[in-house]
Amino acid sequence: MHPTEPPFQRIQFYLTAQYDCSYLPGRLARSQVATPTHLIDHHAYGALIRAGFRRSGQFTYRPNCEGCQACVPVRVDVSGFVPNRTQRRCLKRNRGLAARFLPLDFKDEHYALYRAYLGSRHAGGGMDRDGPEQYTQFLLSSNVDSVLVEFRDGDAVVMVAVIDQVDDGLSAVYTFFDPAREQDSLGVYGVLWQIELAKRLDLPYLYLGYWIGESRKMAYKKQYPPLQGLVDGSWQALEA
């Protein structure tokens, strides 16, 4: 879908200045941003997601980098997904976690978990210095159909996921978890749980953002076949 087609006719698009790529060292990135945010309703947002856009706070964007197409938007066809042996073990290990749907409200324990996660996984990347205001703008500001899911082990919050719902699926916005529980593979469980949620809601897809084959942080997404990628303007199967 091209940005000049419905329902994009009232939405404008601009290109950001170039900035250092977060995933591929030594490369410059640039984004195409949809604006104004108040016109991006549920219907328009779903169309943008299908066109390869993502949401960060109230900004809806997609990569538009000169000479680079490494970022491939991907989605899981949830009806065809069958967990492998390792994923089944992960599901079994974490079945005791209690999931609770919450509005996008600030909670001190969520923010503390977010800081611990970034300090362990993304130290020195800039995000690990996010204060409460940056956290709120990034994860708790939304004009679309969004929910925060809290996962508890007893009294302890061990994982938080922010999820958007669109017409044909769920979009995994961001998930963070207790870095001290690496043996529980909570990141994997978060994806598996969202696949199961999409199935329960009778939605065909879970949108996972961008797959980048050269980035170890993003290449994991091929572990959830059947995976489709938006290539040359059309969604097509990606080889596992």
Swiss-Prot record:
EC number: 2.3.2.29
Cellular compartment(s): Cytoplasm
GO biological process: ubiquitin-dependent protein catabolic process via the N-end rule pathway
Keyword Cytoplasm appears in the UniProt entry: yes
GO molecular function: arginyl-tRNA--protein transferase activity; leucyl-tRNA--protein transferase activity
Main location: cytoplasm
SUPFAM superfamilies (alphabetical): Acyl-CoA N-acyltransferases (Nat)
Catalytic activity: N-terminal L-glutamyl-[protein] + L-leucyl-tRNA(Leu) = N-terminal L-leucyl-L-glutamyl-[protein] + tRNA(Leu) + H(+); N-terminal L-aspartyl-[protein] + L-leucyl-tRNA(Leu) = N-terminal L-leucyl-L-aspartyl-[protein] + tRNA(Leu) + H(+)
NCBIfam families noted in UniProt: PRK01305.1-1 (NF002341), PRK01305.1-3 (NF002342), PRK01305.2-3 (NF002346)
Known role: Functions in the N-end rule pathway of protein degradation where it conjugates Leu from its aminoacyl-tRNA to the N-termini of proteins containing an N-terminal aspartate or glutamate.
Similarity remark: Belongs to the R-transferase family. Bpt subfamily.
Protein name in the entry: Aspartate/glutamate leucyltransferase
Species name: Thiobacillus denitrificans (strain ATCC 25259 / T1)
